[in-house]
Amino acid sequence: MRCFPQLTAAALLLATAVPGSAWAGATFNKTLQLQGTNFQVQSSGEGSQQQLTITTTGAKPAIKPIRQTVNGQVVGAEVADLNANGLPEIYVYVQGAGSCSYGEVVAYAVIKGNEPSPITLPELTGANAEGYQCHDQFQVVEDCLARRFPIYKPGDSNAKASGGQRQICYKLKAGEAGWLLRPTSVDKF
C-alpha cells in the first residue's frame, strides 16, 4: 500500500532542511482543529534547539499545556485520530540542524482526562534502516503516519541518494506504557 505516492509542493516545502543562517529566531505558529479541540502549536528560539509549546481550547476537561525543548526546527504539525477512538492526537514534525536534517515526530494523544499521553515513534532498525541517512518527511495519510526518506547506496553523497525512496506507514497502537507508532507496511519506489 502506498500512503502518498505524490507529495504536494507544500508538503515538500515543509519538510526541507533550513540552512544554518535561517535558524536564528525561527518560529512556527499554527492552529489545528479536530473533534471540537483546537490545538495551538508554537515554537521559538535560536540555534539548533527550539522551545515547543502546545496549548488547547475546546476540550472537556481542559488539557494541560505541553512545553518541551526540541532539537531542531518545527516544520509542520497535524492532528488526526489514527486509532479511531474519537479522541484526537497531535503530530509535530521537527527537522534537525545541519545538512542531514534528521526528522523527528513529537506526538501526543488526548486521553480521557486532562493529561496528554506521549506517543513513541520507534528507531529505524533492520531492513527498514538499510540505506537510511536522514532527510525524513512525515505526513498523516488516512489512518497511518507515513515516513518517507531517500535510500543511500554505498558511495552516494549526502546530496544525492541513488537508491530510490522508502516509505513506512505506522499505525497507532496501545502499548504497555503508552501509545506506540508501529510500522505496518513498507514501500520502496
Language model features with spans:
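Flexible low-complexity loop/turn motifs enriched in small/helix-breaking residues
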Residues: W23-G72, I111
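Beta-strand C-termini and the immediately following turn/loop, strongest in propeller blades
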Residues: S44-G45, Y93-G96
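Acidic, small-residue rich beta-repeat scaffolds with periodic aromatic anchors
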Residues: C3-T8, L13-A17, A22-N38, S44-G47, ...
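Repeat-based blade/solenoid architectures
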Residues: R67-G76, G126-Q133
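Beta-propeller blade repeat segments, especially FG-GAP/WD-type strand-to-loop junctions
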Residues: Q51-A62, Y102-P122, C169-G175
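Short glycine/serine/proline-enriched coil/turn segments at secondary-structure junctions
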Residues: A97-C100, S157-A159
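Beta-propeller fold detector
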Residues: P65-I66, S117-T125, L181-V186
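Residues in Ca2+-coordinating acidic/glycine-rich loops
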Residues: L34-Q35, A80-P88
